[in-house]
Amino acid sequence: MSELLAIPLKRTLEVDFATELSKLIDTTSFQTASFFQSDILKVVDARNNAIAPDISIDGLSALKEYYVILLQLEKKFPNNQIEFTWFQTLSQKSRGTSQYSLQWEKLTIIYNIGCMYSLLALNSNNDAAESLKTSCLYFQNAAGCFKHVLDHQKNLETIPVVDDATLNALTSLMLAQAQECFWFKAVQDKHKDSLIAKLSQQIVDFYCEAINDAQRGKLIRSDWINHLKAKKAYFSAVTYYRIALSFNEKKQFGNVVKALQMGLQFINESTLSSQAKFKTVVESSLKEAQRDNEFIYLQEVPSELPSIKPALMVKPSSSATLLPSIKKDETLFKDLIPIEVMEYCTAYNERQDEYVEQRVTNPLASLNKLLKESLTTFQIPQGLTKVSEAELSHYQASLNNLLINNKNVQVQLDNIEQILNEEAFTDNQLRLKHGTLNWTLPESSTTNTAYYEKLKKLRGYLDEGSAIDKQTNELFQSIDKNLIGSEIRLPESNDPLTNKIKMIIQERNDYIDRTRRKSSEYRILPKIITSYKKNGTVDFEPIFIGHLKYFDEDLRYVNSTKEENIKLIEEVNLSKKNNPGRSGIEPKKMVRIDPRELYIEDLRYSFKLLDEVKENLSAGTAFYENLITSTSNLYNEVQEYDTARRAEKARLDKSLTFEDQ
């Protein structure tokens, strides 16, 4: 067996993986690259071994080892941060292509694994039985690799590794040569001619598919296509020669003549080196068959023969068996925690705090408020103490801090807008300078839309915050500070129900404080890190749902407190109804209010306003913390966007300026 084809390996430029990975680690994780030098060197060595491997099993192993490393890099790093350059080697002119894509690099390596299998198949072929089996397997493995690339490159965001038509042609070529190995083994084993004819017909079908796809593709050169046509013609002749021998055994001598005539027609179309010898055999057999039929058998020679059903014996090997997977004991960067994972933790912490507030602390505070409101007709306000001048100053300072935070966020948002506007301006200027057709970068208006939308949303939040800040400040200024800052000299209530409610309210306030402390100490970070190290994925939602079950006991407490509240309010209402004139409880009066009652009402109102101010200050502080974080995140995103766009514009501007010179 000879005249088989192997697919040449793609060639590449070296990549400074050490520098590129170090930059990525320093910019995308909370660790520094110095902790991962050993892993980085393994990546560097693996690629160096894979870019120009020996045509050997060791070379194949080097390619597969680098493939496994790329699988790990995909799990740990962004796909589009490192540039790779590869040169195709199928056509007469080698052309280079560069892409920022780990996935593209991985599929290119799989393509080269397929090329390596085709080269090993040729090296293994010495016509011995075992070598034929090995070559047959290797050609099927090569077909499996090319098919894998074809099936998966449709998901790439880059240009394909090789155009689809060429990959289809290479897959069919590898299967044709694998089937050829099987056919040759059948010839050696002297199987029936009818079976050998079916085997060779399948080879013809594969070569036919390869020719059609190669002519549609962009890379396979004409001498290869001519070779495929010669192989197709040769095996068409083989098919008819073998079917002629089968007809001869069945004494169908007219069919023998027709089959040999067809075989001679095809062998004349073949340009293979083995064509001449085989042509002599076919011509000799045809002359003998014609002579015998004309003088002895006198059978009619048909105008055509029945179609020959092919016998398919090969298929592309499954990539699951060809390509290795990551071994647990060989995991690289296993302790690397990307910033993305930490951002998930922060987001889940915020959701946990919100969950606790909505399900536990806020309901308890609302229940306490209902209890307090049920006591509004009691003569003596409970829990009121003099507000110190320092405390009032603290509230005023907190209000001032809200205003400062508001201004700082406003400045930061203005800076973000300025960066986006300047980036769009420079893009427009360069587009005017070089012309729209030459300036191929996407317009800023299409790339910065998401940032402007986020900016608009943050400005909306800021305006809402400003309105609430103004309202809170007006509320605080309306409080009678002399009244609440003076000593309150009122006798303690002797009413048992009032004292009971006061104690319950305090217990609930203590429970709120304990729950908040519990939530701040019980964070999801350790669970997320453990899950990420184990699975390498960022699907943490099931973990978070399980994490929140820790607060089920608190939810049950809130439900029991709701029932308690209903009973207490019923007791208060009953007490008012049954004891309208007893000491400590008086019905509301619709007539003239005496100075003591007026003082109590003013005191209640001022403290109510102060409570609202404190609630607004607490909410405002949390609001601005979140807004500052969101604004900083957007600022960082816009800076990264602007930096990337600057680099792209600089490269294109330089390239276009150079072309104009």
Curated annotation (Swiss-Prot):
Stored Pfam families: ALIX_LYPXL_bnd, BRO1
Gene Ontology terms: cellular component: cytoplasm; endosome; nucleus; peroxisome
Cell wall biogenesis/degradation keyword on record: no
Annotated BRO1 domain residues: 3-371
PROSITE patterns, sorted: BRO1 (PS51180)
Top-level taxon in the UniProt lineage: Eukaryota
First and last residue of the signal peptide: none
Coiled-coil zones: 388-422
Cellular localization per UniProt: Cytoplasm; Nucleus
The UniProt record lists the keyword Lipid metabolism: no
Keywords, alphabetical: Acetylation, Coiled coil, Cytoplasm, Nucleus
N-acetylserine: modified positions: S2
Gene Ontology biological-process annotations: invasive growth in response to glucose limitation; protein processing; sporulation resulting in formation of a cellular spore
Subunit comment: Interacts with SNF7 with its BRO1 domain. Interacts with RIM101 with its C-terminal domain, probably binding to its two YPX[LI] motifs.
Function: Required for the proteolytic cleavage of the transcriptional repressor RIM101 in response to alkaline ambient pH, which is necessary for sporulation and invasive growth. May act as a scaffold protein that recruits the calpain-like protease RIM13 via SNF7 to its substrate RIM101.
Other known facts: Present with 2881 molecules/cell in log phase SD medium.
Family, as annotated: Belongs to the palA/RIM20 family.
Protein name: pH-response regulator protein palA/RIM20
Species for this entry: Saccharomyces cerevisiae (strain ATCC 204508 / S288c) (Baker's yeast)
Organism classification: Eukaryota, Fungi, Dikarya, Ascomycota, Saccharomycotina
Gene field: RIM20
